[in-house]
Amino acid sequence: MSLFNTVRNTIVPVHKEGYPFVAAFFVASLVLGWIFKPLFWIGMIFTLWCAYFFRDPERVTPQDDDLVISPADGKVSAIQMVTPPAELNLGSEPMLRISVFMNVFNCHVNRAPMHGRIVSINYRSGSFVNAELDKASEDNERNGLVIETGHGQIGVVQIAGLVARRILCWANPNEPVDAGERFGLIRFGSRLDVFLPAGAAPRVSLGQTAVAGETVIAEFASAKGPVISRRS
């Protein structure tokens, strides 16, 4: 294997949404270094951190239509039955909600939790309280997707946080989506909520670390039996 291929396979790529930020930090480092040389290295530390924040690693997604995959890197912060946000139009009956909180050190690229078709996308403006708080689901800026799957409609909600001020979503209504497929990004700390209908059982526990596109967070009952053992 050539040195070029070794380096390419070792370095985690940066998502294109991060290019302007990385470039800005680098230019600022050059300017600061011109004023006072040690400031260049301080600026480069922030430049590398910015590149790390916008990293976009490849993931290996389990291929099973009964599995629900984590849409985000982070910590499982909530597993509860709640009424879904009204803008999702998923009815008034409680659904299983699994929340994954992303801090500023997590990868912030969001991925689809299941195979299906995007039914709708609904953006709501709001405040920017700590995304780990329960009220963030109702008060904060958010963007909700409804996906039609083989087990019915599920909701995926991107929630802005205390620092995050920009939700990005590249998906469009009526488009097909694959489990683990990238569909959006939230800048600088945020949360993802997944709303699941009856028949879904959680396969993670509170406080567990989840990996977007890889960690199974829930599973739907099927005739073939469970694929993942239930987490206590």
UniProtKB/Swiss-Prot annotation:
Keyword Lipid biosynthesis assigned to the entry: answer is: yes
In terms of InterPro entries, this protein maps to:
PS_Dcarbxylase (IPR003817), PSD-A (IPR033175)
Tell me, what's a Pfam family for it?
PS_Dcarbxylase
Give the EC number: 4.1.1.65
Active site per the UniProt annotation:
S190
Instruction: Enumerate the catalysed reactions.
Output: a 1,2-diacyl-sn-glycero-3-phospho-L-serine + H(+) = a 1,2-diacyl-sn-glycero-3-phosphoethanolamine + CO2
Q: What residues bear Pyruvic acid (Ser) in this entry? A: S190
For this chain, one GO molecular function annotation is: phosphatidylserine decarboxylase activity
- In chain numbering, the residues marked as site (Cleavage (non-hydrolytic)) are G189, S190
Q: Which post-translational modifications are recorded for this protein? A: Is synthesized initially as an inactive proenzyme. Formation of the active enzyme involves a self-maturation process in which the active site pyruvoyl group is generated from an internal serine residue via an autocatalytic post-translational modification. Two non-identical subunits are generated from the proenzyme in this reaction, and the pyruvate is formed at the N-terminus of the alpha chain, which is derived from the carboxyl end of the proenzyme.
Which domain of life does this protein belong to?
Answer: Bacteria
- This protein's pathway: Phospholipid metabolism; phosphatidylethanolamine biosynthesis; phosphatidylethanolamine from CDP-diacylglycerol: step 2/2
Q: Which keywords belong to this entry?
A: Cell membrane, Decarboxylase, Lipid biosynthesis, Lipid metabolism, Lyase, Membrane, Phospholipid biosynthesis, Phospholipid metabolism, Pyruvate, Zymogen
Q: Quick one: a GO biological-process term for this protein?
A: phosphatidylethanolamine biosynthetic process
For the keyword Membrane, the answer is: yes
Which cofactors? pyruvate
Family the entry assigns: Belongs to the phosphatidylserine decarboxylase family. PSD-A subfamily.
Assembly and interactions?
Heterodimer of a large membrane-associated beta subunit and a small pyruvoyl-containing alpha subunit.
Cited function: Catalyzes the formation of phosphatidylethanolamine (PtdEtn) from phosphatidylserine (PtdSer).
Q: What's the name of the protein?
A: Phosphatidylserine decarboxylase proenzyme
